[in-house]
Amino acid sequence: MAPALTALNRCFVLGILLLVTAGTAFSQEVQAENVTVVEGSTVEISCHLHQYDGSIVVIQNPVRQTLFFNGTRALKDTRFQLVEFTQKVVKIHLSDAKLEDEGGYFCQLYTEDTHHQIATLTVIVPPDNPLVEVKEQAVEGGEIELTCISPRTKPAATLRWYRDRKELKGFTSKQENGKTFSITNSIRFNVDRKDDGNIVTCEASHPALKGQKKQTQYELDVQFSPTASIQPSQSLVRDGDELNLKCEVTGNPRPTEIIWTRLNDSLPDRAQIQGDLLSFPSLNLQDNGTYSCQVSNKHGRSSDQYVLVVYDPGAIIEAQTQVPYAVIGGILALLVFLVICILIVMVWCSVRQKGSYLTHEASGLDEHGEAREAFLNGGENHKRKEEFFI
């Protein structure tokens, strides 16, 4: 009885092993690989066959529409192309992959039992160049708020602000739109007129970019009140010379109108105005006076004055020779004064040190003199004592 039970157990175990082996063999008849593709690119979907015996192979899309039936096209979507069908593998190419193509593709093998594997297709959406929006017009002394936007990415992109190669910390928000994300990064900072025209950069990074960055540069537009400055074409002029006065203007918005006037008088008839230029083709002594240019915009106004002095030929030569010598003379006088001060200090220090030395020397002589006198007096007394005893 015992040998019979042992044989029965062996048959049972062998049957279990055969079933497990058969199940393993069947599970390996078809295999699929998960793939990832960038939106708009081409991707390959593969179904690997094991122990293929010519049975029917069907490839279906995520909504279970049949793409290929045993190598024959079944769906009129020409973006799907069968590129290989052998006893080991079935390969199809999907061109211009879209987000709607994402999902599980079924590799089905019809034998005595139906076996299938799912190849999961993941479509990632890289960001375009980010958009930059400004909340309101910036004015000097105020703040500016800029928002960088990446409206459609998958997975969510990372946005950063940079200025002068230094990152600016901002506030980031994320909004989900179906399978994609909209990302924003906002910054605020104080601005002055010197910031007008400076560049800030918004940078987007994403796994699909493979280490590259998408950037958008924004030129700061900071409005400020105008300034005016008159610059002459030459500083010294004489009767008959030509002179151009230019009113150099800054401001945002830039002033479009420049008003030239003459203090307490009208402009000379010969003077010509061409925008920021006030020209005198031929000067004479009657053109002497104070000239002014005035500009304005919505943030303020500004003006500058220039005193015009027209010399005759002799006066202009004298003025040209006196100005350099006056400057040089002033410099030389200052140097002489400094040298005299230094000499006085040196002499005072020298006299002070010498007086101290003479005082000490005199004190020493007095001491030696007293000692010598005492010695001599002592000698005389001794002689007197000797004479007395004799």
UniProtKB/Swiss-Prot annotation:
SMART domains: 4.1m (SM00294), IG (SM00409), IGc2 (SM00408). It is found in: Membrane. It is a single-pass type I membrane protein. GO terms for biological process: homophilic cell adhesion via plasma membrane adhesion molecules; regulation of Rac protein signal transduction; regulation of wound healing. GO terms for cellular component: cell-cell contact zone; membrane. Residues 1-27 form the signal peptide. Keywords: Cell adhesion, Disulfide bond, Glycoprotein, Immunoglobulin domain, Membrane, Repeat, Signal, Transmembrane, Transmembrane helix. Pfam families: C2-set_2, Ig_3, V-set. Belongs to the nectin family. This is Cell adhesion molecule 4.
